[in-house]
């Protein structure tokens, strides 16, 4: 397969991955009203554990449980729990479109954190785009106005932890394979959420399967196709498709929850997306 064909395949896998994550979020928005966040995360990590074992078997990686930097894997896994937890919590209080528009700041936050944590250099153009991206978030959450809610900060906190998680992921690739990272994410995730679920338990019955099974399946599909996408195309090609989450959030929010985003949300989302794609393109040139 030639280079262009591989990139096209990577893009197709990325679209499928983010579509899967979008369906997952639409389901989680309902599920979080009935079950604790930790119950939902526990199910997701169970499926990730199965996925990591299957992926290790497919790639014949018999040492997928051995990490060359256990401390970093644990930190990365804890950041994954925080990032996922805050995003799911945001769906309880905000529309899918609002949550994803604010959360879309994550790629920009990654660049900012990379400057302070990894000592990476950023151009003036990139800093301007980052500033514009933050203005986009302010347009969405509108601090000081009557419609502002402190709950609008939840996806912003999630985006911050996602930024830290992505940086930790970048560092773990220097030590371990994706199968190892998947395995430890699931292992630490299962351990932490099983403890927290004990304190935040909500009654489960057979009807719960209608929530839990799709959550586990679509989360696994999203991760699996994301891995395939990054194997076939550069991250700078794949990352802009992260913003399709906003498009699907508007569609699913309208059809399933009758949420219609206002002009400020749409305008803010456009600004965040445009500045985010610019930042991604600029950083890929370095």
Where in the sequence are the language-model features?
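Transmembrane alpha-helices of multi-pass small-molecule transport proteins
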Residues: 34-82, 161-164, 184-199
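Glycine-/small-residue-enriched transmembrane alpha-helix faces in small-molecule transporters
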Residues: 1-39, 147-171
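Hydrophobic transmembrane alpha-helices of multi-pass small-molecule transport proteins
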Residues: 125-141, 264-283
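Helix-helix packing/entry segments at the starts of transmembrane helices
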Residues: 99-105, 172-188, 223-254
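Loop-to-transmembrane-helix transition segments
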Residues: 9-17, 56, 61-86, 150-158, ...
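C-terminal transmembrane-helix exit sites in multi-pass transporters
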Residues: 87-89, 106-128, 200, 247-266
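Hydrophobic/small/kink-forming positions within alpha-helical transmembrane segments
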Residues: 18-22, 77, 81-85, 107-112, ...
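Hydrophobic alpha-helical transmembrane segments of multi-pass integral membrane proteins
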Residues: 8-13, 39-54, 173-219
């Amino acid at each position: 397969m030639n280079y262009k064909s591989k990139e096209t395949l990577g893009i197709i896998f990325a679209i499928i991955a983010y579509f899967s994550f979008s369906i997952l979020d639409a389901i989680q928005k309902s599920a979080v009203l009935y079950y604790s966040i930790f119950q939902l995360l526990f199910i997701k990590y169970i499926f990730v554990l199965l996925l990591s074992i299957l992926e290790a078997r497919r790639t014949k990686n018999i040492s997928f449980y051995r990490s060359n930097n256990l401390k970093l894997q644990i930190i990365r896994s804890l950041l994954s729990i925080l990032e996922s937890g805050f995003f799911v919590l945001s769906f309880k209080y905000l529309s899918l479109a609002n949550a994803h528009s604010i959360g879309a700041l994550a790629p920009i936050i990654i660049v900012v954190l990379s400057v302070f944590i990894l000592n990476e250099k950023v151009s003036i153009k990139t800093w301007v785009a980052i500033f514009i991206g933050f203005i986009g978030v302010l347009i969405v959450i509108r601090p000081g106005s009557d419609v502002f809610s402190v709950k609008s900060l939840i996806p912003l906190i999630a985006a911050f932890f996602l930024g830290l998680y992505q940086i930790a992921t970048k560092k773990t690739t220097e030590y371990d394979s994706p199968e190892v990272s998947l395995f430890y994410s699931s292992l630490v995730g299962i351990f932490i959420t099983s403890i927290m679920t004990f304190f935040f338990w909500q009654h489960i019955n057979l009807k719960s399967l209608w929530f839990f099974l799709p959550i586990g399946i679509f989360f696994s599909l999203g991760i699996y196709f994301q891995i395939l996408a990054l194997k076939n195309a550069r991250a700078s090609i794949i990352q802009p498709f992260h913003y399709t989450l906003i498009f699907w959030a508007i569609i699913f929010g309208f059809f399933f929850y009758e949420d219609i985003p206002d002009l400020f949300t749409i305008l803010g989302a456009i600004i965040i997306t445009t500045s985010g794609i610019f930042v991604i393109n600029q950083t890929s040139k370095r």
